[in-house]
Amino acid sequence: MVKVTGGANKRVSLAALIAIKPGCRPRLIYRVHKNHQRRAMDQRKGFTEADYAQLLDAAHQQLAGPLVVVWDNLNAHVSAAMADLVDARDWLRVYQLPPYAHELNPVEPLWSHLKRSLANLAKRNLAQLTALVKTRLKRMQYRPALIDGFLASIGLDLTPFCNPRN
């Protein structure tokens, strides 16, 4: 999450996954959610279960195959509503990371890299910040070696099943 200074309720929320398909380069698939309005007390600030399900649907469509997802224990990932959405997708299998195991999540180094690239950059409004975040994420999508580095940083070795780069 990246906040806009001077905008008490304005924020850009991000959701991403790194997809690994045998024989192919790793892919970064993401969604950006702008929140520029006041929220009700019972309304979530960022992504809902339905938003995460849409991200998974997009990944399924782009990868043209079943998905095995390893998730952290974010409330939206472990909720009953999310379990129902997962159960409705026969092409999806979900596993949870152990609690407090962020060092096993390859998306965490991605967020760290993104935040470092945004440090000391001032944007005047939510639209400018959103455009910058999307540009940085798009650049990462075209750098498979960088994504490989995120995977390697958690100790995941892809050499046994990922040979050619497609």
Residue spans for each PLM region:
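Short functional hotspots at interaction and active-site rims
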Residues: 1-166
